[in-house]
Every structure is written in structure tokens, then in C-alpha cells.
């Protein structure tokens, strides 16, 4: 068994398993209010003081912080880091937003296609959500009878992911991510 640096060079490190468990926690946690309404919380909330979803999201952010720091350390230049973070986030986000607004929305809306595509909210859903601030979760006529009539409820996390990118970048610029400074900052 190698040290952490050696284990991270391969994909044999169980992070995918941890991500799968965290995703399952979020799925279970969200199933209660999505199927039964906002007042319904998962049964373990009273015993744990945190939902499984909260624990899953916390786990995702911890893993992200670890890998984002690793990305900064492996980047040849600061520009490489910024470009890598942009390319990690925005192409996938754009695809999700376009598919949601232009495929899922038209297939499941209660409106006519003309009314759906004429609504300003469809275009704002794409352009506004690319800004990652004040996320718009609803599309016109889509899932209106659901306890939560939105789509892509997890988009809110991306704003905090970008804040984490900025924090790692700032810590790297001031030298807190170098091996010697890491020890002095945390001890």
C-alpha cells in the first residue's frame, strides 16, 4: 500500500465509491420532500441532526476541495488552473441547461410549444443560470403539479464550487498550498 500521493496517481483510490454513496444519500434525502411535499423530511433527520442529503453534499464538497487543490498543484501555470476549472464546469453546464430548456421542457410542459418557446423564462433559464447566481429552477408549464415544480435543483451547488475554485486559487497565489507553508498554516 502506497502513500496518498502514490494512490492518487491511479484511479484505484475509492473516491468513485465514496461519490456513489454520497449521491445515494442525496437521492434518498430528496425523495421525501419531492414525493411527499416540503414538510416531509427523512426519518433519520431527528436522530442525526443532519439529513443524508446534507451529509452527501458535505462529502461532495470535501472531495471537491481535495481534487481542486490537487488540480492547482498539478497545473503548470495559474492560467492553466483557471482554464481547467472553466472547462470542467461550463461545457457540461451548458449542455445540461440546453437539454433541460430545449428537450425536457418542450417534451413535458403543459403549454403549447409556441407558448413555451415564446416565454422569456426559457431563454433566461439558460443565460441566467450560466451566471451561477440567483439560479432559476422553473421552466414554464413544467412539473407544475409536483411538490417542487423545478428542474435541476442541484445547480445551486455550482456557485459554491466556483467560490471554492477562487479560494484555492487565492491560497495558491499567496503560497499556502506549497508543502512547507501547508504545515505552518494548519499547525
Regions found by a protein language model. Name each.
Residues 1-12:
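Short, Lys/Arg-rich, polar N-terminal cytosolic tail immediately upstream
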Residues 2, 56-87, 92-115:
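Juxtamembrane transmembrane-helix termini
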Residues 12-72, 90-93:
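Functionally critical transmembrane alpha-helices in membrane proteins and complexes, commonly lining
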Residues 12, 76-81, 174-182:
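Membrane-interface helix-boundary motifs at transmembrane edges
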Residues 162-187:
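Solvent-exposed interhelical
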Residues 30-33, 100, 104, 172:
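Structural signal for membrane-spanning alpha-helices in multi-pass inner-membrane proteins
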Residues 48-54, 90, 94-162, 166:
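Membrane-interface helix-loop-helix regions
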Residues 35-42, 74-75, 105-113, 177-181:
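Transmembrane helix-loop junctions in multipass membrane proteins, especially transporters and channels
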